[in-house]
Amino acid sequence: MEKLRKVVNEIAYTRVHTNSPALHRSLVPFLTIASSLYGVALQIRRSLYRYSLLQKHRLPVPVISVGNLSWGGNGKTPMVEYISQFLVDSGLTPLILTRGYAGGDEVKMLERHLRGGPVKIGVGANRAATAALFLDKYGCVDSSSLRSFFDLHERAQVWTISEKIGCIILDDGMQHWSLSRDLEIVMLNGLNPWGNGHLMPHGPLREPLLALERADVAVVHHVDLITKQSLRDIENMIQGFKKSIPIFYSKMVPKYLFDVKNARSHVALEALRCASVLCVSAIGSADAFVKSIEMTGAHYVDRLDFSDHHLFEAEDVETMSRRAKGLEHKSNCKPIIVVTEKDYDRDPEILKCLDSYTVLVLCSELQITPILETDVDSFNYTLMKALAAKFYVSS
């Protein structure tokens, strides 16, 4: 099954299959049919909401949706964390609503990062029902209080944070149409935003690119890893669907590492300098992870990629060990195995089985990158403006 997932992923990011292996070419017709059926189902579902045959729920506090058009590597979860922390720093308690699917690695990572703070995380497929449970339990900041909050924020004065929920963040919300939102943020993987341009499963697209028209803000992620020409091409594509959309830029900045045997340990990035490193990951954009390790100054970098959200098993650990031994033979030194936080949070215990090697977890954080007239201040202003607009308050 893992091999099939990897093959489908390779097909999704390949535009021409003339030189592809026979297995890839044999699957393309079936994937094309499946994509057509998926597209029809998507149109029907969208129409049901458009004509109010399916109900949209309006929540009593501002809602920010963070989503994407394609699977994996778009920076969606780091952006959710960034917005959560910004809201807390501003004095509002956010509630993150997430499905928590595919092993729940993203939820576990958010819980670990945000533990001890006021941020609340609601997990469930029915996000309207999950929101109702949290709003009943904690209450919400009423409109008059939010007006006071925006007034104080405009004057750069402090607002005292409370347990009451002041904003809701929809994690992976772009295709979750049952909840109305006040700001729609679409995240795009700058390394390969559209893949082969087809809908799933033939391609990586969860919706046609026309869905960019619904977005209020576009964020190009991994902007530090792409060329200026690639960035211009992405901007032109986005603005071809919505000329007026503000475009921001983000990147993942490595901060430190920790040992899988001690999550409280703190290992400096310099530990990888001049070292042999085996990058092991089961994430949506392994290329970005590997490039970030290369930029630490590692002497030799090898990689072992699994499909997104893959749950490591004993045979995978054996594969990692064999690959590490091969790297040790090539480089004449014992390699360090590095994984991502999502891989660690998916199953922290199984990685401890690699006891013959040092296994480190790379910790990174999302940063808004200043390009042209956009920077972190203008992005934060956009967030506040959207929240204030719900109550017709000028921010």
From Swiss-Prot:
It comes from the Eukaryota. It is found in: Mitochondrion. Keywords: ATP-binding, Kinase, Lipid A biosynthesis, Lipid biosynthesis, Lipid metabolism, Mitochondrion, Nucleotide-binding, Transferase, Transit peptide. Disruption phenotype: No visible phenotype under normal growth conditions, but plants lacking LPXK accumulate high levels of disaccharide-1-phosphate (DS-1-P). InterPro entries: LpxK (IPR003758). It catalyses: a lipid A disaccharide + ATP = a lipid IVA + ADP + H(+). Residues 1-32 form a transit peptide. The keyword Transferase applies. HAMAP family: LpxK. Involved in the biosynthesis of lipid A, a phosphorylated glycolipid that in bacteria anchors the lipopolysaccharide to the outer membrane of the cell. Transfers the gamma-phosphate of ATP to the 4'-position of a tetraacyldisaccharide 1-phosphate intermediate (termed DS-1-P) to form tetraacyldisaccharide 1,4'-bis-phosphate (lipid IVA). Lipid A-like molecules in plants may serve as structural components of the outer membranes of mitochondria and/or chloroplasts, or may be involved in signal transduction or plant defense responses (Potential). This is Probable tetraacyldisaccharide 4'-kinase, mitochondrial.
